[in-house]
Amino acid sequence: MADHNPDSDSTPRTLLRRVLDTADPRTPRRPRSARAGARRALLETASPRKLSGQTRTIARGRSHGARSVGRSAHIQASGHLEEQTPRTLLKNILLTAPESSILMPESVVKPVPAPQAVQPSRQESSCGSLELQLPELEPPTTLAPGLLAPGRRKQRLRLSVFQQGVDQGLSLSQEPQGNADASSLTRSLNLTFATPLQPQSVQRPGLARRPPARRAVDVGAFLRDLRDTSLAPPNIVLEDTQPFSQPMVGSPNVYHSLPCTPHTGAEDAEQAAGRKTQSSGPGLQKNSPGKPAQFLAGEAEEVNAFALGFLSTSSGVSGEDEVEPLHDGVEEAEKKMEEEGVSVSEMEATGAQGPSRVEEAEGHTEVTEAEGSQGTAEADGPGASSGDEDASGRAASPESASSTPESLQARRHHQFLEPAPAPGAAVLSSEPAEPLLVRHPPRPRTTGPRPRQDPHKAGLSHYVKLFSFYAKMPMERKALEMVEKCLDKYFQHLCDDLEVFAAHAGRKTVKPEDLELLMRRQGLVTDQVSLHVLVERHLPLEYRQLLIPCAYSGNSVFPAQ
């Protein structure tokens, strides 16, 4: 036998060598071996032709498998015929087995130092049986996918091997035995909770999920919205929360109607300064609400500052061709603002916000017109004096173009800086002159008593349902109407007769005897047919128990006492 190296890999050859080293060299005597010895003696004395035929039959009877038939026949046809024991079978396997491992690739069949934790189990299993040794020495993660142990879960082992091949570029792991066991444990835990990553060749694009379409965040739009919301004063934000409030004319969306020039760093700084002056307006208004002259003066200063900022933004544009579209856009915006101002003045003139508001609005419009005229005068002055100089010409053309929006800016600031209305004024202003929501007039309600449903008719419908139930077949609507008419006539006559009878006899409470006497006069109750018999004929037991305490029918009593 070959020398046995205990640290070699667990290949079929090494496993068989270990079994041969640890097994007993002498096979125990069994009854089957006695028969085998007799056959061997018979084979030695037989002719060569008979010998070949009997060896074939014995090999077929012993093998019971397609793989070992040729090997056993070949071994027995050789010169020395040995008994078919496990030891001889293992020797034959060692003679015919290849040097390379069947279960593992060539790259894995290398001497790997075994950990110390596995050595005691090997020593114990050497004294024991083969079944206890093979599962411990078998590496779970390096098995080929097609040759798995029968007691293992195929899906988990396949996925672990596949994931290991994907992680290492389709090359199996060359880690030690202990690390392989630990990695297999962690990967089995990972496989229970997550799906392994599949390579590009295995993925099918038709079955893959589409990634969710997420819109990219537009930082520019976010900053623009933030700037628009920061421009609105807090009093306007609070006014928008009032019920049925009118939309403000100077809301931040008005800024988008003016033509915008491309911004630069200096223009942004000037616009920020203009916004600071604009936001300082509500503070002025809160500090001195009762001083209209100071309020108007502060407002005029803010308007001039904003106009200067607007002039600085438009000063970057040079030439008459670039001023003309700006001038046209400003004229269109001025027309729109004038129309809105006319509508606002009409609403104020109707008395929706009180005469004091009308006077205040007129004062503001006069101030804005005066400021506009001053702006035009100032614009004409520098334009005439500095005709030769280049820089003065550039400054004069935006001033002449922005003389008209000065009044617009004044009106806009006037609307932003208007004092917050008192609670009474807010209630008055909540009633719009032009109704936005059309309110329908309430329906006239009748104050009289509700028409009650006739209980007589309700009772008739109940009896009609009973009639259709006892008919035990579908009935047409006309037949049900006829039944209802007959029942109506019958109950009407019965009620009239009962009323006349009770009034004639002076009864305050109608008793069953009175009803029986009335029905006898009507011919329904006779000497042959009593009231109880009539009730038994036409009413079931449940209704009879409610109407009468006891009913006699022959020798039986209903209900049973």
From Swiss-Prot:
Principal localisation: nucleus
Alphabetized PANTHER family for the sequence: CENTROMERE PROTEIN T
Low complexity compositional bias, start-end: 34-46, 395-407
Protein origin, superkingdom: Eukaryota
GO cellular component term, pick one: inner kinetochore
Source organism of the structure: Homo sapiens
Compositional bias annotation for Basic and acidic residues: 18-27, 357-367
Record PTM Phosphoserine, positions in chain: S47, S343, S345, S356, S373, S385, S386, S397
InterPro entries in UniProt: CENP-T, CENP-T/H4_C, CENP-T_N, Histone-fold
Disease field: Short stature and microcephaly with genital anomalies: An autosomal recessive disease characterized by growth failure resulting in severe short stature, severe microcephaly, and delayed and dissociated bone age. Additional features include global psychomotor developmental delay, pubertal delay and genital anomalies.
Function: Component of the CENPA-NAC (nucleosome-associated) complex, a complex that plays a central role in assembly of kinetochore proteins, mitotic progression and chromosome segregation. The CENPA-NAC complex recruits the CENPA-CAD (nucleosome distal) complex and may be involved in incorporation of newly synthesized CENPA into centromeres. Part of a nucleosome-associated complex that binds specifically to histone H3-containing nucleosomes at the centromere, as opposed to nucleosomes containing CENPA.
Keyword Ribosomal protein among UniProt keywords: no
Family as reported in the entry's similarity comment: Belongs to the CENP-T/CNN1 family.
PTM note: Dynamically phosphorylated at Ser-47 and probably also other sites during the cell cycle. Phosphorylated at Ser-47 during G2 phase, metaphase and anaphase, but not during telophase or G1 phase.
Record Pfam families: CENP-T_C, CENP-T_N
Protein name (database record): Centromere protein T
Positions of the UniProt region annotated as Flexible stalk domain: 93-421
UniProt-listed GO biological process terms: cell division; chromosome organization; chromosome segregation; kinetochore assembly; mitotic cell cycle
Bias kind Polar residues: ranges: 276-288
Entry text on domains: The largest part of the sequence forms an elongated and flexible stalk structure that is connected to a C-terminal globular domain with a histone-type fold.
Residues with PTM Phosphothreonine: T85
Keywords tagged on the record: Cell cycle, Cell division, Centromere, Chromosome, DNA-binding, Dwarfism, Kinetochore, Mitosis, Nucleus, Phosphoprotein
Region annotation Disordered: where it falls in the sequence: 1-83, 256-292, 333-457
Compartment annotation: Nucleus; Chromosome, Centromere; Chromosome, Centromere, Kinetochore
Protein's gene: CENPT
Molecular function terms, GO-annotated: DNA binding; protein heterodimerization activity
Oligomeric and partner information: Component of the CENPA-CAD complex, composed of CENPI, CENPK, CENPL, CENPO, CENPP, CENPQ, CENPR and CENPS. The CENPA-CAD complex is probably recruited on centromeres by the CENPA-NAC complex, at least composed of CENPA, CENPC, CENPH, CENPM, CENPN, CENPT and CENPU. Identified in a centromeric complex containing histones H2A, H2B, H3 and H4, and at least CENPA, CENPB, CENPC, CENPT, CENPN, HJURP, SUPT16H, SSRP1 and RSF1. Interacts (via N-terminus) with the NDC80 complex.
